[in-house]
């Protein structure tokens, strides 16, 4: 070292070169032999505690968990849930949307039958010489925000005996760019299946916000659309059926990484999105066919008119919206969800098994307080949610604002045994009177 090196220190422990045996230089930093030895000891300890590979680690950890019955053990036709049974279960959690429920129920039932047919041919219990192969029919759900698309998918996951994963299309980008590869969608399904590849290959994937990957213009651009058309291109083979290489730890793939191969031929894909503006494209097409403008019937709301237009959707309309023709062709089944009116929002507040009113009643019951909503208060909440135009999502925000002071004060008060929410309290967003005079509240007709 030169004479200028006398003040060099380790960038990690701060010891000078005179205090250590060796000081190793890097680009702008230095590390001493003691820090190198300490790092080696830490790495050795971690390697001794952890299995040798990420996949082995995941496998060993899932062996300690209760095992879920494999779909391979129960795919006889007698055990497959019927479409009516699936829809009945969805009715317990989701209000309305009967057409979408029927589409999903039939699709899931047929998915089970496809798996049963494949299993029968492999085991020799079915007609091995039958040349007919059952092809899957991927599904597209369209509807305004807050209409229940994601909730339908989440509710399906509770009843199904096959792995079910939910993914978000907005996080996906074309390979080689910042963001998630499309293979990460399969990783989620693989994790739900406890890294059982054969079980994951029988699963169902729901891709939310699929309309957000529409290309930015109808005509191809000279600039790359890495989060739009690029993602659609990457999803094509996965939707149709291909053997994909999935990195076990997620993230980007690299040449020196061990990947898990998954065949997507038997994975059912359900895509959902709001598709804002698609109704205008349908309206324009229908207007041209009728040699003029088409108008909604008198008394029809704008939301209901948009939903009626989506029921007349054709594949070309989706292409004009920004979905490439190859992508549209791989999702043959389409269903639109109806917008939620005031009556539907009231039902959502009170009727489902996980209704918001029931949730907050349970929360206050844990503090030994009975919570009651007057029927007019429930209607006022629904009216405010309808005004916000965000569907059922607005309900929780409104009720949370309304209940904030109640939930803040009640745990500290032992004199309150019952709380009543009235329409006036909803409109003024105030619960002060309720908290100050709990004993003077008369017994009302509650919702």
UniProtKB/Swiss-Prot annotation:
- InterPro entries linked to this entry: AAA+_ATPase, ATP-dep_Clp_protease_ClpX, ATPase_AAA_core, Clp_ATPase_C, Clp_protease_ATP-bd_su_ClpX, ClpX_bact, P-loop_NTPase, Znf_CppX_C4
Q: Which residues pair up as cystines?
A: none
What molecular function terms (GO) are annotated for this protein?
A: ATP binding; ATP hydrolysis activity; ATP-dependent protein folding chaperone; protein dimerization activity; unfolded protein binding; zinc ion binding
The ClpX-type ZB domain is annotated at 1-51
Record-annotated residues binding ATP? Answer: 144-151
Task: Tell me the Gene Ontology biological-process terms attached to this UniProt entry.
Answer: cell division; proteolysis involved in protein catabolic process
Comp. bias regions, Low complexity: 50-60
**The keyword Repeat belongs to this UniProt entry's keyword annotation:** no
Annotated stretches, region: Disordered: 50-77
Q: Which NCBIfam families match?
A: clpX, PRK05342.1
Q: What is the name attached to this protein's record?
A: ATP-dependent Clp protease ATP-binding subunit ClpX
> Which species is listed as the source?
Gloeothece citriformis (strain PCC 7424) (Cyanothece sp. (strain PCC 7424))
Classification lineage: Bacteria, Bacillati, Cyanobacteriota, Cyanophyceae, Oscillatoriophycideae
Q: Which gene encodes it?
A: clpX
């Amino acid at each position: 070292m030169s004479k200028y090196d006398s003040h060099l220190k380790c960038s990690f422990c701060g010891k000078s070169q005179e205090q250590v045996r060796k000081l190793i230089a890097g680009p702008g930093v230095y590390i001493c032999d003691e820090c190198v030895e300490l790092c080696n000891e830490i790495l050795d300890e971690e390697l001794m505690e952890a299995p040798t590979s990420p996949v082995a680690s995941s496998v060993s950890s899932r062996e300690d968990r209760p095992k879920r019955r494999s779909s391979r053990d129960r795919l006889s036709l007698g055990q497959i849930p019927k479409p009516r049974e699936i829809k009945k279960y969805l009715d317990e959690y989701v209000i309305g949307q009967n057409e979408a429920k029927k589409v999903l129920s039939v699709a899931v039932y047929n998915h089970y039958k496809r798996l049963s047919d494949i299993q029968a041919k492999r085991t020799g219990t079915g007609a091995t010489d039958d040349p007919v192969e059952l092809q899957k029919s991927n599904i597209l759900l369209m509807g305004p925000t807050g209409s229940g698309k994601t909730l339908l998918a989440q509710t399906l996951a509770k009843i199904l005996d096959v792995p079910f994963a939910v993914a978000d299309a907005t996080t996906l980008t074309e390979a080689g760019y910042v963001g998630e590869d499309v293979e990460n969608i399969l990783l989620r399904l693989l994790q739900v299946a406890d890294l059982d590849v054969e079980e994951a290959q029988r699963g169902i994937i729901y891709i939310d916000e699929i309309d957000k990957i529409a290309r930015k213009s109808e005509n191809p651009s000279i600039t790359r659309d890495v989060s739009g058309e690029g993602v659609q291109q990457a999803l094509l083979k996965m939707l149709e059926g291909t053997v994909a290489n999935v990195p076990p730890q997620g993230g980007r793939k690299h040449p020196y990484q061990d990947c898990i191969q998954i065949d997507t031929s038997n994975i059912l894909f359900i895509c959902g999105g709001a598709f804002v503006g698609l109704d205008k494209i349908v309206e324009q097409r229908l207007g041209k066919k009728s040699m003029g403008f088409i108008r909604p019937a008198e008394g029809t709301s704008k939301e209901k008119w948009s939903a009626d237009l989506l029921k007349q959707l054709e594949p070309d309309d989706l292409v004009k919206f920004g979905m490439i023709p190859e992508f549209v062709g791989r999702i043959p089944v389409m269903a639109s969800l109806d917008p939620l009116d005031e009556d539907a929002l009231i039902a959502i507040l009170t009727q489902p098994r996980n209704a918001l009113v029931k949730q907050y009643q349970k929360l206050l019951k844990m503090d030994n307080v009975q919570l009651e909503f007057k029927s007019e208060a429930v209607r006022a909440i629904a009216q405010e949610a309808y005004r916000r135009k965000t569907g059922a999502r607005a309900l929780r925000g409104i009720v949370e604002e309304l209940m904030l002071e109640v939930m803040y004060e009640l745990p500290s008060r032992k004199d309150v045994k019952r709380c009543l929410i009235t329409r006036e309290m909803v409109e003024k967003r105030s619960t002060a009177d309720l908290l100050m005079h709990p004993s003077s509240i008369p017994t009302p007709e509650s919702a």
